[in-house]
Amino acid sequence: MNQTLLSEFGSPLERVERALEALRAGKGVMVLDDENRENEGDMVFVAETMTTEQMAMSIRHGSGIVCVCITEERRQQLDLPMMVENNTSHFHTAFTVTIEAAQGVTTGVSAADRLTTVRAAAADNAKPSDLNRPGHVFPLRAQPGGVLTRGGHTEASIDLATLAGFKPVAVLCELTNDDGTMARAPEVVTFAKQHDMPVLTIEDLVAYRLREEKKAG
């Protein structure tokens, strides 16, 4: 059903291209996963271009759980322990301990403060002491290999940032409806049109990456 709903956004490969163009222009994109998986739409932004307004929109229209997606290398660089040793969550979502910027924030909750935290975590020369633990931003560690290894929003966000030419750090937040329920594909499409955001699926991104690797090979 998702593919039919999304046909107005172009073919699967066109949807990825449009998403990459939007990210390069400093906009956000909506990423849907499989209807048989979480069946959720996440707002995704590149960490290094995200604005306070975009963070505020994520908090206002999202679940409130703002996540910064990072690689294993960056997790080690920041010395962030995983939230639990034995991950029993359904999709093995790889949360680390939560973080707060050590400088430049007040309570850490506002959109500006959360963006400051994201920027501190994304800085090239970021070090463990730049972040306090716990905090109000939730790092997620992506699997090496991206969506070709794990078809999750975390990996999709890192892949999109990288393919768009940015460092592999991205911000995501699940879109929710006004009544607090999770937004599914029809609501995601409506929201995306209202906010001029492209929509793509993780399936689209897998197809795009496989095509790119085939061309490279």
UniProtKB/Swiss-Prot annotation:
Its cofactor is Mg(2+); Mn(2+). Its EC number is 4.1.99.12. Keywords: Lyase, Magnesium, Manganese, Metal-binding, Riboflavin biosynthesis. GO terms for cellular component: cytosol. Binds 2 divalent metal cations per subunit. Magnesium or manganese. Pathway: Cofactor biosynthesis; riboflavin biosynthesis; 2-hydroxy-3-oxobutyl phosphate from D-ribulose 5-phosphate: step 1/1. One of its GO terms (biological process) is riboflavin biosynthetic process. Pfam families: DHBP_synthase (PF00926). The record marks H136, E174 as: Essential for catalytic activity. Mg(2+) 1 binds at E38. D-ribulose 5-phosphate binds at R37, E38, D42, R150, G151, G152, H153, T154, E174. GO terms for molecular function: 3,4-dihydroxy-2-butanone-4-phosphate synthase activity; magnesium ion binding; manganese ion binding. Mg(2+) 2 binds at E38, H153. It catalyses: D-ribulose 5-phosphate = (2S)-2-hydroxy-3-oxobutyl phosphate + formate + H(+). Signal peptide: none annotated. Catalyzes the conversion of D-ribulose 5-phosphate to formate and 3,4-dihydroxy-2-butanone 4-phosphate. NCBIfam families: ribB (TIGR00506). Belongs to the DHBP synthase family. Homodimer. This is 3,4-dihydroxy-2-butanone 4-phosphate synthase. The gene is ribB.
